């Protein structure tokens, strides 16, 4: 009997990749907090998750370095964030407190998905070994 990882892991396998990409975007925002003209960005999580599922659903794999890599940088996935604070005069829209808060929240959600995946993998290993 074949094991369907899509059924076993559900949406959590896709959330890990989207949350990882979001961590990169949020880190970039924090790193550029003092860069004049830098515009804070964020990922439209639901749209990125949907696109990640669709990309994975095609079963595309890069078996050669000449293959094109799939990216989550499609239009609409990474968007500019609307600033909550008034313009400081240099055109930078990064609110460091908001970025740190979002980064922490994203990290906790990533950890939650990772723990869920680990428990699913442990369950599958027990099933394969014949344990309860």
UniProtKB/Swiss-Prot annotation:
Signal peptide positions (record): none
Pfam families: Flg_bb_rod (PF00460)
InterPro entries on file: Flag_bb_rod_N, Flagellar_basal_body_rod_CS, FlgB
Keyword Transport in record: no
Compartments in which it is found: Bacterial flagellum basal body
GO biological process: bacterial-type flagellum-dependent swarming motility
Major localisation: other
Any Gene Ontology CC annotation: bacterial-type flagellum basal body, rod
Keywords annotated in UniProt: Bacterial flagellum
Entry function: Structural component of flagellum, the bacterial motility apparatus. Part of the rod structure of flagellar basal body.
Subunit structure: The basal body constitutes a major portion of the flagellar organelle and consists of a number of rings mounted on a central rod. In Gram-negative bacteria, at least four rings, L, P, S and M are present, whereas Gram-positive bacteria lack the L and P rings. The rod consists of about 26 subunits of FlgG in the distal portion, and FlgB, FlgC and FlgF build up the proximal portion of the rod with about 6 subunits each.
Family affiliation: Belongs to the flagella basal body rod proteins family.
Protein name, entry field: Flagellar basal body rod protein FlgB
Native organism: Aeromonas hydrophila subsp. hydrophila (strain ATCC 7966 / DSM 30187 / BCRC 13018 / CCUG 14551 / JCM 1027 / KCTC 2358 / NCIMB 9240 / NCTC 8049)
GN (gene name): flgB
């Amino acid at each position: 009997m074949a094991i369907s990882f899509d059924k076993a892991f559900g949406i959590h396998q896709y959330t890990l990749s989207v949350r990882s990409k979001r961590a990169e975007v949020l880190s970039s925002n924090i790193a550029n907090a003092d860069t004049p003209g830098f515009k804070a960005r964020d990922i439209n999580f639901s749209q990125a998750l949907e696109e990640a599922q669709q990309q994975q659903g095609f079963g595309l794999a890069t078996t050669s370095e000449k293959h094109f890599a799939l990216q989550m940088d499609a239009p609409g996935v990474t968007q500019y964030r609307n600033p909550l604070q008034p313009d400081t005069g240099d055109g930078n829209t990064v609110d460091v407190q908001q970025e740190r808060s979002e980064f922490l929240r994203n990290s906790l959600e990533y950890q939650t998905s990772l723990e869920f995946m680990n428990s699913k993998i442990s369950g599958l290993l027990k099933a394969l070994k014949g344990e309860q």
